[in-house]
């Protein structure tokens, strides 16, 4: 394996993406980088962890930033063939492909409410809840995600219920490349990017709109600004890995199940310095 390299994908509309359909059947407007991210996610979450294929793509994907790590993999396409006298009848041929081996995404605020302690979620919907009430169905994902409101959430150990935070997720590495610090490379890359781009997701006054501004001014918060808080909904089995990267378990957030797997909330705060409100 050659030296891994990482590609960044900014939020994309992903219009027409077919949930659960094979990657080679997706419309041509879908970025190859996103298809590569989904190739890794489907290998890890769908094939290994048995998450339903139609649940792997969700309404946060269009509004998220995605990173994909690649490795240059040499593959033998044609074996060498010799005759009885040792003469080469068919030469050996090989090719090198930049193969996606890991991915991660960064979801901006606002978010859905914190999961319920003890709750069981399937495709982001709590058991017994109407999956259509938030527009979350196999329709226009970009529209559903863009309509998320800023809300007052319940307080937890590290979140006061209203501070904007970003969320890391969909961290996945192909099995044969685990143990090579690929996951750590992805996480530290995203955290470094956040430190360098702390205002990336902050809405301007124009974008936020005066109507929403009045609504938020009823709380302690004015124009939503990210102040360095990063969240992870971590599978219970990988909590120790996230701790190595600076995250702490939010005990008051509790434990819940996503696609049958136990999860916990984890947070860390990055030092990002002073920021100003965007006007344009």
Q: For the regions a protein language model found, what residue spans apply to each?
A:
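C-terminal "cap" of GNAT-fold acetyltransferases
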Residues: 237-239, 248, 255-280
């Amino acid at each position: 394996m050659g030296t891994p390299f990482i590609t960044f994908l900014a939020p994309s509309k992903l219009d027409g993406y077919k949930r659960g359909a094979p990657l080679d059947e997706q419309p041509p407007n879908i970025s190859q980088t996103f298809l590569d991210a989904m190739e890794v996610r489907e290998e890890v979450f769908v094939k290994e962890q048995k998450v339903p294929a139609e649940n792997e793509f969700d309404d946060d994907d269009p509004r998220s930033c995605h990173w994909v790590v690649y490795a240059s993999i040499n593959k033998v396409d044609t074996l060498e063939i010799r005759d009885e006298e040792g003469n080469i009848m068919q030469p050996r041929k090989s090719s090198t492909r930049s193969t996606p081996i890991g991915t991660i995404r960064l979801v901006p605020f606002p978010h859905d409410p914190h999961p319920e302690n003890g709750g069981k979620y399937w495709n982001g919907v709590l058991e017994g809840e109407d999956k259509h009430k938030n527009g979350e169905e196999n329709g226009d994902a970009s529209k559903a995600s863009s309509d998320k409101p800023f809300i007052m959430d319940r307080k937890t150990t590290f979140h006061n219920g209203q501070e904007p935070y970003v969320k890391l997720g969909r961290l996945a590495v192909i099995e044969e490349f685990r143990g090579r610090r690929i996951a750590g490379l992805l996480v530290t890359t995203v955290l470094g990017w956040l430190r360098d781009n702390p205002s990336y997701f902050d809405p301007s006054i124009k974008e936020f709109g005066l109507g929403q501004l009045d609504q938020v001014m009823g709380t302690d918060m004015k124009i939503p600004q990210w102040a360095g808080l990063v969240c992870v909904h971590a599978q219970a089995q990988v909590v120790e890995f996230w701790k190595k990267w600076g995250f702490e378990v939010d005990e008051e957030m509790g434990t819940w199940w996503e696609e049958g797997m136990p999860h916990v909330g984890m947070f860390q705060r990055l030092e990002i310095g002073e920021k100003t409100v965007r006007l344009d």
